[in-house]
Amino acid sequence: MSRTLFVTTALPYANGSFHIGHIMEYIQADIWVRSMRMAGHTVHFVGADDAHGAPIMLKAEKEGITPQALVARYAAERPRYLDGFHIRFDHWHSTDSAENVALSHEIYRALKAAGLIETRSIEQFFDPVKGMFLADRYIKGECPRCHAKDQYGDSCEVCGAVYAPTELIQPYSALTGATPVLKRSDHFFFKLSDPRCVEFLQQWTTGSNRNGIKHLQSEVQAKTREWLGGEEGEAKLGDWDISRDAPYFGIEIPDAPGKYFYVWLDAPVGYLASLKSYCDKIGLDFDALLDPSSATEQVHFIGKDIIYFHALFWPAMLKFAGRKTPDALNVHGFITVSGEKMSKSRGTGISPLRYLEVGMDPEWLRYYMAAKLNARVEDMDFNPEDFIARVNSDLVGKYVNIASRAANFITRHFEGKLAYLGDTAALSAEFAQQTESIRAALEAREFNRAIREIMAYADGINQAFDAAQPWVLAKGFAEADEARRAQLQDICSRALAGFKALSVMLAPVLPALTSRVARDLFGAQRDFIWSDAADLPAQVAPFKHLMQRVDPQMLDALFEPPAELAAPAPTPGGEALADTISIDDFVKVDLRIAKIINCEEVEGSTKLLRLTLDAGEGRHRNVFSGIKSFYKPQDLIGKLTVLVANLAPRKMKFGVSEGMVLAASHADEKVDAGIYVLEPWPGAQPGMRIH
């Protein structure tokens, strides 16, 4: 039965060019969309630029241009990347559009009418020079715990402490250097903690769509249980501040002059705005297409770093605005290079534009990513040696090799005509069965399984061809009898029919190459669809070169050379290194190995865990740590960690903290939102001092 699908990828933020992570997500979605279309389904595949927010406003101001001009500059780059990698969106739009304004207003008004918008007066730091309220990332100061300088307004990168911006010592604006002042402002909150939202999300996150497809992968569902609680657990959802004060580049909130939607509210609405723009363009009824009762399936491809917004806020917003909720979130991991996080300074950064500029085939990358991606939330590793081997061995050595060998015999001896001995029904059925297995794997997003099956099938075709030894039959062809000629023609015809079937299987992954195969080699008038695999070809044109091998020197050119040691990255971890200290200063800090004897949540705190530590002193210490968002208490019990043992005890609202455990985090949550508690290597014992 034919299905109708509305498919999106996460919206790229319009203050920079595409990076390889964007391209990976777009290729994954594009392969899936092409596969669904080949099955006869109707797919509306749209994207857009995420064009609002303070970072865009401030970057444009720094460059002396308008935010719209900055967004337009990056929007103009998009086709070069998308076309370059054969990524075929139906429509590309912007959140800075009339459609997005109208839809954001409609959704907000519906949520307000449902009693899910609440106004609260909050106190924030305000930059008197800039004349704007400051987000945490734009406030710096001295950490109230370890007294490290130049720490951001919500957490310390040195000691891992989490705090409110008002707790910073000598805070200053990262924009102007001015001392911020506290100022009150009315903000609008979406009441995600409302029992109606909690009940809906507990059902939606564990549910399936009308086709029985789970809304969430098992890993994502498990993550949402941490926020929603299980059957016996209590939900830990906080209400969401959806407003920002002027000056702000965004969509003004209805009936609230000087108040704007926070970018994370109008950004996902941009999915709908892009579809609305596309529907208006081609004459489709947008409202009917996305009516809650319609059969349209709404599918979002996103990265694992934005699960919270897409699995909680987004479906709840849509549900209580009376709109269709998502049918599936397809979440993927990050991309690494040779097992490491990409880094320009280490020469492991991949620029998608550079990939194209050095002359590398975009379909090499599409194939390689398909060979590595699956339906789980796993990181994909790009290994240069593996990349070369897979392309040269699989695509050229196995797949293309079939056509180049068999077609030459057919064109030289049979004028391009194919003929088969015996009953061909079994051969057609075999192709149909194998192709259906590939189609199902691609629909399930098990791309790596599909590629393994395709290459195993190619191995079988090559082995059968080699075993038949057509080059022996071709010797003395002019004097050969009809039986021998027919046998040669049959062997090569079957190999080429197999090559055609393989091309159908690979069509979603290699759209440009398989289009040439369909049209130039087999004389088709259109690109392949799944059912074409079972139709045995009757004629081929002379073989033309299809794909070159990867030259290892291309990989050398792809990776940017490591930065000179004399010029390291100025802000590792998102911030500059602290001032140099002497060894005498360092030894004043007593760092000890400590074992976590117990760990529990702190009632009344959304950030803190209470750790009971054994530091080899014959007694236990009580330490509070702001790591609740990233660790379950039961997962920490029994672990070793690092304790600042001689830090003066600090009296807190919840008790006395007798030291500090060390943790690492990045200054910019958009780069890495995690907090990582330090854990010594096995063998270290509680009480050992770190030197």
From Swiss-Prot:
E.C. numbers: 6.1.1.10
Enzyme category, top tier: ligase
Entries under Pfam families matching the protein: tRNA-synt_1g (PF09334), tRNA_bind (PF01588)
GO BP of this protein: methionyl-tRNA aminoacylation
Motif residue range(s): 'HIGH' region: 12-22
Chain location of the short sequence motif 'KMSKS' region per the record: 341-345
Reaction(s) catalysed (UniProt annotation): tRNA(Met) + L-methionine + ATP = L-methionyl-tRNA(Met) + AMP + diphosphate
Single annotated GO MF: ATP binding
Cofactor note: Binds 1 zinc ion per subunit.
Major localisation: cytoplasm
UniProt protein name: Methionine--tRNA ligase
Lineage: Bacteria, Pseudomonadati, Pseudomonadota, Betaproteobacteria, Burkholderiales
